[in-house]
Every structure is written in structure tokens, then in C-alpha cells.
Amino acid sequence: MFSRVLVAALVALPVLVSASPTPGGYPDSTTVVSQCNVGELHCCNTQQTPDHTNAAGGLLGAAANVGALLGFDCTPISVIGIGGNNCAAQPVCCEANEFTGLINALSCSPINVNL
């Protein structure tokens, strides 16, 4: 009788182990990726479209792409939420960092960060 229980347990054990979930795979929908495809991640207190800032951009010698944002008073963010680099304003990905007067970052795109 004991040998039948032992054999049944030995046969069932590999089946149970093979059906166990393993770590890794695809991230769930709540995973936040704080990575820019192009450029660097910044926290900008103000963003303006170039049509609102053409006069200021021309005076400061800053060339901006049409449709992109200009970032004002920006600070770099290494990883959101780590090391005290939290962004109370709008996090943006910027292609160029040119410190020409008031404009800190050029060609910025806002990113959505749901924490």
C-alpha cells in the first residue's frame, strides 16, 4: 500500500513542478519603463511649443524643431523614483540639451508616468 502512494507521488511531482509559474517573461501592465527612445529623460518646470517661443528662441540662438517642445528650467532624471529624482512637474524626453540662456532642452516630448 505504501509503495503505491510513493509511486503516485513520484509521478505527480514532475507534473506539478512543470506547471509552476516562473519569474520573468513579459512585464505586467503596471510596470513603468522610464527610458527614452531618443534623448535623455528630464524634469522641466515649463514646456512651450516653438510657435509661442520663436521670438525668445531667435534671440537666444536656439533652433527648435517644429512640433517639438522647448523645455525651461529642466533637470536630468536618472531613474524615476530612485535617488530622490522625483519629478513634480512634467517629465519629458529631450533630444538636445543646450543651455542657451533660459532654454535648457530642445526637441522635448512629454511622457506619461503612472506611478
From Swiss-Prot:
InterPro entries: Hydrophobin, Hydrophobin_CS
Cellular component per GO, a single term: extracellular region
Keyword Amino-acid biosynthesis in annotation: no
Localization per Swiss-Prot or TrEMBL: Secreted; Secreted, Cell wall
Signal peptide extent: 1-19
Superkingdom, natural source: Eukaryota
Key words, A-Z: Cell wall, Disulfide bond, Secreted, Signal
Transmembrane segments: none
Keyword Kinase: no
Molecular functions per Gene Ontology: structural constituent of cell wall
Primary localization: secreted
Disulfide bonds: 36-93, 43-87, 44-74, 94-108
Pfam families associated with the record: Hydrophobin
Family of the protein in this entry: Belongs to the fungal hydrophobin family.
Assembly, per entry: Self-assembles to form functional amyloid fibrils called rodlets. Self-assembly into fibrillar rodlets occurs spontaneously at hydrophobic:hydrophilic interfaces and the rodlets further associate laterally to form amphipathic monolayers.
Chain's role: Aerial growth, conidiation, and dispersal of filamentous fungi in the environment rely upon a capability of their secreting small amphipathic proteins called hydrophobins (HPBs) with low sequence identity. Class I can self-assemble into an outermost layer of rodlet bundles on aerial cell surfaces, conferring cellular hydrophobicity that supports fungal growth, development and dispersal; whereas Class II form highly ordered films at water-air interfaces through intermolecular interactions but contribute nothing to the rodlet structure.
Protein name listed in UniProt: Class I hydrophobin C
